[in-house]
Design a protein with these regions (language model features):
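Short catalytic/ligand-binding loop motif for oxyanion handling, primarily in non-cytosolic enzymes
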Residues: 15-17, 112-119, 195-199, 246-249, ...
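His/Asp/Glu-rich, glycine-adjacent segments
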Residues: 60-202, 284, 299, 308
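Active-site metal-binding loops of divalent metal-dependent hydrolases
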Residues: 11-12, 241-244, 338
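A structural signal for short, well-ordered beta-strand segments and their strand-loop junctions
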Residues: 39, 103-108, 186-190, 239-240, ...
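Metal-dependent active-site segment of extracytoplasmic phospho-/sulfohydrolases and closely related
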Residues: 6-7, 26, 214-258, 398
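Active-site neighborhoods of enzymes that stabilize oxyanions during catalysis
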Residues: 273-397
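Short, structured active-site-proximal loop/turn typified by the sulfatase FGly-forming signature C/S-X-P-X-R
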Residues: 18-54, 58-62, 105
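Acidic/histidine-rich catalytic neighborhood
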Residues: 229, 234, 241-291
Length: 419
């Protein structure tokens, strides 16, 4: 029997959340029948887009190339999200599946825009200004959703975005529609709770319980869609996450330090016209770019001297960060003190008490909580429990189930879970 596989990423789901979710019917059903990894260690940085690239490729960021949620744009503190798949530098699971002639689908998975090897594609569109049906249709078609797929699976559920402002409900509904109608061989789904609620309320607030209830409803709907597809006997389902979060109390703006030390050139309106060093936030860490390598010792000394004033516990050199699997063309990485998140602004104080955000991530994966992995279906040994694994272990394991190859993967196959 050929295996089919659905991988659901519930963003920032903690292992500890299972105590609450185990009281819910669908999670109780899953927990009583699944193979499980109790605690999965994430990658550095513990940030959504790099994490999902690692989940899709089995590689660390220094190899797959996605090191942030947003593009590096010096002088611009706004977010330019990495929508498109061309950010990847290695083969992912969807590529591998198409090489074997399998059908593929993805809904809400970061950086899948215009992916050439996803048959049923609904990209994650973050920070869009769209508010109407037509504006959302434009954005989704722009990122690779075929018009006929929009009409069949997106349009019937777009009210979740236009009226309820719920990307979560839209993604879950569209994915279930795809499973019911087309029963693809490989499906990836990303839903943004409980991450969104933890950002707003902190990691342990009772206000995140409605987000966990949404996760229960999502699982209920997916299980029903699998039954409705007519392929219940061949489908495997994985429910997991990408990272966890920590509570934050302060915001750090290293670019303010650079501006005060003439490493940024500003015009009379305070806009950046040139830069020698630029800090790009990765949440509770930040990558520091140095335009001219001869300035690197000056920038390093300045940052080292001001680590406490920036809410940092340490600074990684390029070589040290690469040893953590986190490397691109930046020179340094600033790591949080465990209470501070970073922003790109240069016109604010270097360190201020937190305002809006109460929880965040992007920190080194040795910090904070871990997330679970629950797997059910004919490919998995019911009742098997592994105490831990690594985020990069998922993709090579899913590749083995699907009968495809990921030769670049850094992770290892979780043989103990498989039949």
């Amino acid at each position: 029997m050929a295996h089919k596989l659905i991988v659901v990423s519930m963003d920032a789901l903690f292992a500890e959340d299972l105590a609450y979710l185990s009281q819910k019917p669908s999670f109780a059903y899953l927990l009583n029948r699944c193979a499980m990894v109790q605690k999965v260690k994430s990658i550095y940085p513990t940030l959504t887009y790099p994490c999902h690239a690692s989940m899709a490729t089995g590689c660390f960021p220094k190899k797959h190339g996605v090191v942030n949620n947003t593009h590096f744009v010096p002088g611009d503190a706004s977010s330019h999200w990495i929508w498109y798949h061309d950010a990847y530098r290695v083969k992912d699971l969807h590529d591998a599946c198409k090489e074997k002639g399998l059908t593929t689908a993805s809904v809400g998975w970061p950086s899948t825009g215009k992916h050439p090897h996803i048959d049923y594609l609904v990209d994650e569109i973050a920070a869009t200004k769209a508010t109407t049906d037509e504006e959302f249709r434009h954005d989704y078609l722009l990122t690779g959703t075929p018009p006929e797929l929009w009409d069949a699976v997106c349009a019937p559920h777009i009210h979740f975005r236009t009226q309820e402002r719920s990307v979560f409900k839209f993604n879950a509904a569209a994915c279930c529609e795809i499973i019911r109608r087309y029963a693809p061989d490989f499906v990836t789904l990303h839903v943004g709770e409980p991450d969104h609620s933890r950002h707003l309320y902190g990691i342990s607030s009772e206000q995140i319980l409605p987000a966990l209830d949404l996760c229960e409803q999502c699982l209920t709907d997916i299980l029903q869609a699998i039954r409705d597809s007519g392929h219940e006997e061949s489908y495997n389902l994985v429910v997991t996450a990408d990272h966890c979060q920590m509570d934050v109390t302060h915001t750090s703006c290293p670019n303010a330090l650079f501006a005060a030390n003439n490493l940024l050139t500003l015009d009379t309106d305070g806009k950046v016209t040139d830069w020698r060093a630029w800090s790009h936030s990765t949440g509770m860490s930040a990558t520091v770019y140095v335009k001219d390598s001869t300035d690197a010792p000056v920038v390093y000394a300045l940052l080292k001297k001001n680590l406490p004033q920036l809410g940092c516990s340490r600074i990684y050199t390029q070589e040290e960060a690469a040893a953590e699997g986190f490397s691109r063309n930046f020179s340094f990485v600033l790591e949080t003190d465990g209470h501070t998140r970073f922003e790109d602004h240069w016109d604010q104080p270097p360190l201020t008490p937190i305002g809006r955000t109460k929880g965040s991530h992007g920190f080194h994966p040795e910090k904070g909580h871990r997330h679970p992995l629950l797997a059910i279906g004919p490919a998995f040994i019911e009742g098997t429990i592994l105490p831990e694994s690594h985020l990069t272990d998922g993709a090579p394991t899913w590749a083995k189930i699907l009968g495809v190859s990921l030769p670049d993967a850094d992770g290892h196959i979780l043989e103990e879970l498989l039949t």
